[in-house]
Amino acid sequence: MKKHNFTAGPCILNDLVLKDAASACLNFAGTGLSVLEVSHRDKEFDAVMLEARNLFKELLDVPEGYEVLFLGGGASLQFYQVPLNLLKKKAAFINTGTWATNAIKQAKIMTQVYGGEVEVLASSEDKNFSYIPKDFVIPEDVDYFHFTTNNTIYGTEIRKDFDTKTRLVADMSSDIFSRPIDVSKYDLIYGGAQKNIGPAGATFVLVKTDVLGQVDRPLPDMLNYQIHIKKDSMFNTPPVFPVYVALQTMKWYKELGGVKVLEKMNLDKAALIYDAIDSSKIFRGTVNPEDRSIMNACFVMKDEYKELEKEFATFAASRGMVGIKGHRSVGGFRASLYNALPIESVQSLVSVMKEFEAKH
């Protein structure tokens, strides 16, 4: 039975990427060594790192003045590293979910040590993060404005580039490469690579170099973006295998036609699942329709059918649907529609939903 992987992360990977990665595990770039054991200082991996950074820029049409880093530590480390490098007096945030909450928490911890302020402009916590706040103004007297573009747990997404003179910092862990973005509007974009780029273990940072070096506090080398830029992401041993797989994924994106093609594919997948939810007699969505994520579709049973949730979870699993259980803070179900998920998988899930509904 074919399995359909809707897991929220680590993400589904394309079969061609997996086959290439499997081959490299036995013989990487003709070295006779596994990519899992090759030295990161070898010229073969140096070429991988360089190509990965350059292709990242190419896919997003990154202008001059930006650098791409592949680091360890995940987005969770960036929650502290970003304010450590950028926050001088004040940073502004909007709180749209768990990961934004964590970013705010770590920024506040940083200010407790080094001074500065954290201002939360708006929050959707009052309705369990089921919408994106819109009634706020981005101040111009802050060092930067931070937001999380896609909220995997709650299924909301900010699919626009804010137009402001204030420096923009975005956590794009779960929707990077899912749509075109105007990189010139951002000063720093970061995220874990395990949603839309590769396996867990790598973290990407896209940073405008002229925003760095402006804080007067001492920075540990491992948390200093300028050190990592100077060392081409190899100040310490990088996540070799995740970077290799990320490169193969980005090559596949390029072969498909780039980010605009990926966006069309993602919109088509999202339309399928949301149409099924909206037309259902037993399922309903959990967030404001205008704020729906094209990466993570969250839904629950309508109140009168709540007792069927466990039955549907078992039924869907028996039909090959993997990873559709919703986060414990929301409940219900979540279908993650990351770039590598084929539309056939979404069609299969919709068929399963309709089959189950017909029984009840």
From Swiss-Prot:
Pathway this chain belongs to: Amino-acid biosynthesis; L-serine biosynthesis; L-serine from 3-phospho-D-glycerate: step 2/3; Cofactor biosynthesis; pyridoxine 5'-phosphate biosynthesis; pyridoxine 5'-phosphate from D-erythrose 4-phosphate: step 3/5
Residues noted as binding pyridoxal 5'-phosphate in the record, renumbered to the chain: 75-76, 99, 152, 171, 194, 236-237
Catalysed reactions, as listed in the record: O-phospho-L-serine + 2-oxoglutarate = 3-phosphooxypyruvate + L-glutamate; 4-(phosphooxy)-L-threonine + 2-oxoglutarate = (R)-3-hydroxy-2-oxo-4-phosphooxybutanoate + L-glutamate
EC number: 2.6.1.52
SUPFAM superfamilies named in the record: PLP-dependent transferases
One Pfam entry name: Aminotran_5
Protein name in UniProt: Phosphoserine aminotransferase
PROSITE patterns: AA_TRANSFER_CLASS_5
Cofactor, how bound (note): Binds 1 pyridoxal phosphate per subunit.
GO cellular component: cytoplasm
Single GO molecular function: O-phospho-L-serine:2-oxoglutarate aminotransferase activity
Cofactor: pyridoxal 5'-phosphate
Subunit structure: Homodimer.
Gene Ontology biological process terms from the UniProt entry: L-serine biosynthetic process; pyridoxine biosynthetic process
Compartments, record wording: Cytoplasm
Residues with the N6-(pyridoxal phosphate)lysine modification: 195
Functional description taken from the UniProt entry: Catalyzes the reversible conversion of 3-phosphohydroxypyruvate to phosphoserine and of 3-hydroxy-2-oxo-4-phosphonooxybutanoate to phosphohydroxythreonine.
